């Protein structure tokens, strides 16, 4: 049987290539300048089930707004609008 080189291999269907969606900062896109710490339902989008703040690489926010989210979450925790730690928050 003859050896096929890499250029001779043909597929019936082309191999699927996973294309990652580009992450974007939702605050810059929608023009939000102030993150309200008194809105716990909005802040819960940036927390995991344990109540920890999700990192930028997951949420896609910019550094500037990630710092503002962290500050807003900490203020909401201090005012008892959000729990410090929890099990199955969502």
UniProtKB/Swiss-Prot annotation:
It comes from Bacteroides thetaiotaomicron (strain ATCC 29148 / DSM 2079 / JCM 5827 / CCUG 10774 / NCTC 10582 / VPI-5482 / E50). Keywords: Ribonucleoprotein, Ribosomal protein, RNA-binding, rRNA-binding. It holds the Pfam family Ribosomal_S18. HAMAP family: Ribosomal_bS18 (MF_00270). The keyword Ribonucleoprotein applies. Belongs to the bacterial ribosomal protein bS18 family. Part of the 30S ribosomal subunit. Forms a tight heterodimer with protein bS6. It comes from the Bacteria. One of its GO terms (biological process) is translation. Binds as a heterodimer with protein bS6 to the central domain of the 16S rRNA, where it helps stabilize the platform of the 30S subunit. One of its GO terms (cellular component) is cytosolic small ribosomal subunit. The keyword Membrane does not apply. GO terms for molecular function: small ribosomal subunit rRNA binding; structural constituent of ribosome. This is Small ribosomal subunit protein bS18.
């Amino acid at each position: 049987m003859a050896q096929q080189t890499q250029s001779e291999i043909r597929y019936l269907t082309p191999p699927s290539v996973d294309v990652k969606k580009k992450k974007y900062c939702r605050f810059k896109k929608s023009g939000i300048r102030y993150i309200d710490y008194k809105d716990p339902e909005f802040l819960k989008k940036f927390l995991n089930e344990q109540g920890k703040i999700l990192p930028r690489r997951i949420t896609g926010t910019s550094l500037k707004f990630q710092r503002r989210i962290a500050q807003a979450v900490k203020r909401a925790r201090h005012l008892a609008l959000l729990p410090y730690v929890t099990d199955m928050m969502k």
